């Protein structure tokens, strides 16, 4: 029993195990089938997605799509991180710049600035040619011969400086002679070579650290202190104040400013009354003279008012008794004023302000002290900064080696300026010299104001001698016999009171450079005298006589002695000037011009011109011009032009021309043009043309075109064409065309063509065509073509065509063209043209042109032209063109053409075309064609076409064609899914079934049979076991 139980237990265990295995197998197969369905569903989804995106049937693209998406996500993340890093980096300079800006502002606020300040700098260059200034331009009211020292002399003196240099000067006393020229005036100040890099320009070059001091003595005018009176400054009327100067003042070239004043004196003014003129601290009224005076205000030979300078540098005028007897007194006053070297120590912008009472004038000028003269390692500059005409003394300050270069065995000499009648006395008795050492070149003031307490006095360590009459010599005795820092030499000398000449000095620095070459550099100093003036007048006051004591008594009438010493001056000046001038010029010009002009001109001109011009021009012009011109011109032109032009032109031209032209041309052209054109053209043309052309063309064209064309053409054509063409073309075209065409064509054509073409085409076309064509055609064609074509085209065409064509054409053409063009054009043209043309032309053209043109043109032209032309043309053209064109054209053309053409062309074309075409065609065609064609074509075309065609065709055709076409049909089935299924799947938005399979019933049946078979086997084994028992 136990054994049986055990056996039953074993059998039952075994049966349960078999059932479990079968059930597990069924479940496993079911799960496996479910996974396979999911995988199939995913595969189908990926295939359709890939097909929708790339329109490709390549199975590899199915698996590549998800990888591409993952890669894009990764790239996007990387780009984001990179941009974040760049943003962080970019913020640091901004923060630094903000800090620097704040620091700069803080520094600027410490310097007081008044008025409008403009930062500008000029400088003379460090070359001998530039530093040698001629110091021309005469001062107004210059008195170079006056040497009076009387108390009434109001002349002020300013210094004039100029550098000189020479080489290989063996004799120390030998110097270069430079002729004296007139000193520069205020408005025409001398050397004007400019270089901001050599100028230490500051916004306000005013020394505010030291108290204001005057370099002149006020003792001479203290005795003229006014009598006690009242200040009537604010009672003056009709007050005018002006500052007259150029934008730049050169103090070391006798530069100064004019202070102009005008006013009316109240009738109540009496002797002793005063008024005050404020003078800015940046100016002084003495120049280099030690004693400052201001001019009296004169009324004829009478003094109206006397002026003195107070301790603040302002001017106080005191009225004389002239105002006691005059009414309506008016006065004007002009005073020269000079830049104060103590208060303006550096080159820079300075705002000047002066006034009478509440009426003031302000002006900002650039004070340019100019750079020292330099020749190789030698540098020097000097100035005469003080003249005492009472004591007959002067002071000269010289900067030796201000550049801080290394000068070996330096020697400084001072003499009278050659070829001048200088009044200086140079000897041991009349000349005292002090020498100061400067540790740092930046410690030197550009105005040559020197405070001796700030520098080391080394006078005792140098050797000062007077080797020749009117000459001193300073030898710098250093331990190594060379200097590397600047030195200041101050010369206090005397002038000869009996001399008729002016003060003129020359200072020369000698020394070796590191190559032991002996050179010299000189600097000349002179003075210029400037006068101030004051004038006024008035009307005599009425006098009330004494009344008689008794009635009837009559006072005797005095003789009339009315005296009016007032001075009125008026000047009328007329000038007639005739001038002849000849000019050869090379010009770089940048101009902005607006011009309205009406011009009648007859001109004959011969001109050779080389011109570089950048021009922006707005011009409205109406011009009638008869011009005969011979011109040889080489021109590089970048031109941006907006032009509105109305032109009526009648021209009759007979021209015989032989032309050989070599031209290099690169052209970038942007053109906007609106064009309406009515053209009637009769043309007889005999043309022989040999053309070699390489053309690469990128063309974007939007064209709306309506065309009515009646064409009768007789053409005989023999064409040998080798064509390589690379063309990228995107074209949107709306075309309405009515065409009647009759064509008789005899054509022999040998064509070898390699063509790569990418074309997208959408075309809408309505075409009515009646065509009678007789064509005999022999054609041998070898064609390799890769074509991708997208095209958008809307076309309505009615065509009646009669054509007889005889054509011989040999053409070699290489063309690269990028064209952007917007064209609106209105044109009426009647043209009769007979042209025989032979042309040889080599043309390279570089042109960058942006043109917006609105043009209305009426042109009647009769032209007879015989032309021989050979043309080799390499043309690179970038062109964008938007063209709206309405054209009515009646054309009758007889053309005999021999043409050899080799053409390389690459074409990418996008075209959408909807075409409605009604065509009646009767064609007789005999065609022999040998064609070898290799073509790779990717073409996407949306075409809506309505075509009504009546065609009668008799065709005899012999054709040998070898074709190698690699074209993948767009609708070929793949992976058991045909195009219709794909379309249905694409249009259906419902999700795929969970199983992803269509043989669901078959699978269930198979597994049911397997289960039944397992059950039979199980029951059979049980039965066998029972039988064994």
Curated annotation (Swiss-Prot):
Residues 37-200, 529-1000 are annotated as: Disordered. InterPro entries: Adhesin_Fg-bd_dom_2, Adhesion_dom_sf, Fibrogen-bd_dom1, LPXTG_anchor, SDr-like, SDR_Ig, YSIRK_signal_dom. The keyword Secreted applies. Residues 547-565, 603-957 have a biased composition (Acidic residues). It is found in: Secreted, Cell wall. It is a peptidoglycan-anchor. This is Clumping factor A. The gene is clfA.
């Amino acid at each position: 029993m136990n054994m049986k139980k055990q056996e039953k237990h074993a059998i039952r265990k075994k049966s349960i195990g078999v059932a479990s295995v079968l059930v597990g197998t069924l479940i496993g197969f079911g799960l496996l089938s479910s996974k396979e369905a999911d995988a199939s569903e995913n595969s189908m989804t990926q295939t359709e997605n890939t097909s929708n995106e790339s329109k490709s049937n390549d199975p590899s693209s199915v698996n590549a799509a998800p990888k591409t998406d993952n890669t894009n996500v990764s790239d996007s993340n990387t780009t984001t991180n990179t941009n974040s890093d760049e943003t962080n980096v970019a913020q640091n300079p901004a923060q630094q710049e903000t800090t620097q800006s704040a620091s700069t502002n803080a520094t600027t606020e410490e310097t007081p600035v008044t008025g409008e300040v403009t930062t500008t700098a000029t400088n003379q260059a460090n070359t001998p040619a530039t530093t040698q200034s001629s110091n021309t331009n005469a001062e107004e009211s210059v008195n170079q011969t006056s040497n009076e020292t009387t108390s009434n002399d109001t002349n002020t003196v300013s210094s004039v400086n100029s550098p000189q240099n020479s080489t290989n000067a063996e004799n120390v006393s030998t110097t270069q002679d430079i002729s004296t020229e007139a000193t520069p005036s205020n408005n025409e100040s001398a050397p004007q070579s400019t270089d901001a890099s050599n100028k230490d320009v500051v916004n306000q070059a005013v020394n505010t650290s030291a108290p204001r001091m005057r370099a002149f003595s006020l003792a001479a005018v203290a005795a003229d202190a006014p009598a006690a009176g009242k200040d009537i400054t604010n009672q003056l009327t009709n007050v005018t104040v002006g500052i007259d100067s150029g934008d730049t003042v050169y103090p070391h070239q006798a530069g100064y400013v004019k202070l102009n004043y005008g006013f009316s004196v109240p009738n109540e003014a009496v002797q002793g009354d005063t008024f005050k003129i404020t003078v800015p601290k940046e100016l002084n009224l003495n120049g280099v003279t030690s004693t400052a005076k201001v001019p009296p205000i004169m009324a004829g030979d009478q003094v109206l008012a006397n002026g003195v300078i107070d301790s603040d540098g302002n001017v106080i005028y005191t009225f004389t008794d002239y105002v006691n007897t005059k009414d309506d007194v008016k006065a004007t006053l002009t005073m020269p004023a000079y830049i104060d070297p103590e208060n303006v120590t550096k080159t820079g912008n300075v705002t000047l302000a002066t006034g009478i009472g509440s009426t003031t004038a302000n002006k900002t000028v650039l004070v340019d002290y100019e750079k020292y003269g330099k020749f190789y390692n030698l540098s020097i500059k000097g100035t005469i900064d003080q003249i005492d005409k009472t004591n007959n003394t002067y002071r000269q300050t010289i900067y030796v080696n201000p550049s801080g270069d290394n000068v070996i065995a330096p020697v400084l000499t001072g003499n009278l300026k050659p070829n001048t009648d200088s009044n200086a006395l140079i000897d041991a008795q009349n000349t005292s010299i002090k020498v100061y050492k400067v540790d740092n070149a930046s410690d030197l003031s550009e105005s040559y104001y020197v405070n001796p307490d700030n520098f080391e006095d080394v006078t005792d360590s140098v050797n000062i001698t007077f080797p020749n009459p009117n000459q001193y010599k300073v030898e710098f005795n250093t331990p190594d016999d060379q200097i590397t820092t600047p030195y200041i030499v101050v010369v206090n000398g005397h002038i000869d009171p009996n001399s008729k000449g002016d003060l003129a000095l020359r200072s020369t620095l000698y020394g070796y450079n590191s190559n032991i070459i002996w050179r010299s550099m000189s600097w000349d100093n002179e003075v210029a005298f400037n006068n101030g003036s004051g004038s006024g007048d008035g009307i005599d006051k009425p006098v009330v006589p004494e009344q008689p004591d008794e009635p009837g008594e009559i006072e005797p009438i005095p003789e009339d002695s009315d005296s009016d010493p007032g001075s009125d001056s008026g000047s009328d000046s007329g000038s007639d000037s005739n001038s002849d001038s000849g000019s050869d010029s090379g010009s770089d010009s940048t101009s902005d011009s607006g011009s309205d002009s009406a011009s009648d001109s007859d001109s004959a001109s011969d001109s050779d011109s080389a011109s570089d011009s950048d021009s922006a021009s707005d011009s409205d012009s109406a011009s009638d011009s008869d011009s005969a011109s011979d011109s040889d011109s080489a021109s590089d032109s970048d031109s941006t032009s907006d032009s509105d032009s109305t032109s009526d032109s009648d021209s009759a031209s007979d021209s015989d021309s032989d032309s050989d032209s070599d031209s290099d041309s690169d052209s970038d052209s942007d053109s906007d043009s609106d064009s309406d054109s009515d053209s009637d053209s009769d043309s007889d043309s005999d043309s022989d043309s040999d053309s070699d052309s390489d053309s690469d063309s990128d063309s974007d064209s939007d064209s709306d075109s309506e065309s009515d064309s009646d064409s009768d053409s007789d053409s005989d054509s023999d064409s040998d064409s080798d064509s390589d063409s690379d063309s990228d073309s995107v074209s949107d075209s709306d075309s309405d065309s009515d065409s009647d065409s009759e064509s008789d064509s005899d054509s022999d054509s040998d064509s070898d063509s390699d063509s790569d073409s990418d074309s997208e085409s959408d075309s809408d076309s309505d075409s009515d065509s009646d065509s009678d064509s007789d064509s005999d055609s022999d054609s041998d064609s070898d064609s390799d073509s890769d074509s991708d074509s997208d095209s958008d085209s809307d076309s309505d065409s009615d065509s009646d065509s009669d054509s007889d064509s005889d054509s011989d054409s040999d053409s070699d053409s290489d063309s690269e063209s990028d064209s952007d063009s917007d064209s609106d054009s209105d044109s009426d043209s009647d043209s009769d043209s007979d042209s025989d043309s032979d042309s040889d032309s080599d043309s390279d053209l570089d042109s960058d042109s942006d043109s917006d043109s609105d043009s209305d043109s009426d042109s009647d032209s009769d032209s007879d032209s015989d032309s021989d032309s050979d043309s080799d043309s390499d043309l690179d053209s970038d062109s964008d063109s938007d063209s709206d064109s309405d054209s009515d054209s009646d054309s009758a053309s007889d053309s005999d053409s021999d043409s050899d053409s080799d053409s390389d062309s690459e074409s990418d074309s996008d075209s959408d075309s909807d075409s409605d075409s009604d065509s009646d065609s009767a064609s007789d065609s005999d065609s022999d064609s040998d064609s070898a064609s290799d073509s790779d074509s990717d073409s996407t075309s949306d075409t809506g076409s309505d075509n009504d065609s009546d065609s009668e065709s008799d065709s005899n055709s012999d054709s040998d064609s070898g074709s190698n076409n690699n074209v993948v049909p767009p609708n070929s089935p793949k992976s058991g899914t045909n195009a219709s299924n794909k379309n249905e799947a694409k249009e259906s938005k419902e999700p795929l079934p969970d199983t992803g399979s269509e043989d669901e019933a078959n699978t269930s049946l198979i597994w049911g049979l397997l289960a039944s078979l397992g059950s039979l086997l199980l029951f059979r084994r049980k039965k066998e076991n029972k039988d064994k028992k």
